[in-house]
């Protein structure tokens, strides 16, 4: 297909219909009315704002999550905002179909109404970046900036969002680390269209710094501090937030997800296809078949951490997986890869070159004529010399599961601070996972989870 045909077909599938727009508009009007009534009933000084893709008209057909922010005056103490904001959110949610309390920087209410998820989030009623007190406050400014600058390019944003979803690079959540919707909107506003953005996949990487509101000129001291900090963190891109020079919009974007975007953009421009936007479902496979084919071993730790949110949990799981990788390699096992996540219980998967090691481990020691050499000689039962260096041996546990248990008992693995105790109590499985993890184990072992050529 020609490029124009591809884009035309995709737009027809992702642009909301008139009926869908009418439904969304009516829903938002109902929610605004309910919010205003509840604010008045409770005697609160607050204003409801819709933020996010519905408020900017950059949402994809069928994607109707609503973000309703409940903005309190700047002089409101933070604890009072949290308390009254949650009270107001609950009062609004009582008029809806169902709700629960969720937690981010502060508690908020997650509700359902007419089949649509509605997040009711307390925030400050900010006018500019200097007013920002909490992370969510910027959302009001983001919505305002996009609406003022998009100038009818809504479908271009939709194309970019759908492309990023199709290549598995969309979402700034900690378990994705891709492009946020706001970043997609900024790139279209800055460069003009979906095609302009994908054509600049290489240029963006080389340019590195994107400053749509010229903060480096208007607030050089603040903006340069942001650039320096993010450069030291080795980010793929530094996109200075158009509404706040202190923030890099692409701070959560990983090199892996940018690399995926980089190669898929090249492939799409060479051979345009609707499949980039709506890829076929990958064939399912058996993790046990993969294990047999690879001749490797799979160790899975199942960890109970019910009250920990993903943004806190996942970095700690990753740190722990790296700790296991380093320690097991010191113990003589080759770690070919690891995977972490949560499917009910949290998990750490480790692929190893083998499940058992030799019963005897050689211990290289120091040179014999040193104080450490004399100490090594005293402490070991069998000692021999090769040249100037001392050597000994010791009997060790062979099974990797036994080795892991011993390492955890002796506190010899660097683990995430908040989950150390939970990992010590983890169930450790060898070459087996429960049913809910079978697909994850296959995707991990086959590397289809990360394969950018698929």
UniProtKB/Swiss-Prot annotation:
Keywords: ATP-binding, Magnesium, Metal-binding, Nucleotide-binding, Nucleotidyltransferase, RNA repair, RNA-binding, Transferase, tRNA processing. It comes from the Archaea. It catalyses: a tRNA precursor + 2 CTP + ATP = a tRNA with a 3' CCA end + 3 diphosphate; a tRNA with a 3' CCA end + 2 CTP + ATP = a tRNA with a 3' CCACCA end + 3 diphosphate. GO terms for molecular function: ATP binding; CCA tRNA nucleotidyltransferase activity; magnesium ion binding; tRNA binding. Mg(2+) binds at residues 65, 67, 119. ATP binds at residues 53, 56, 142, 161, 170. HAMAP family: CCA_arch (MF_01264). Belongs to the tRNA nucleotidyltransferase/poly(A) polymerase family. Archaeal CCA-adding enzyme subfamily. This is CCA-adding enzyme.
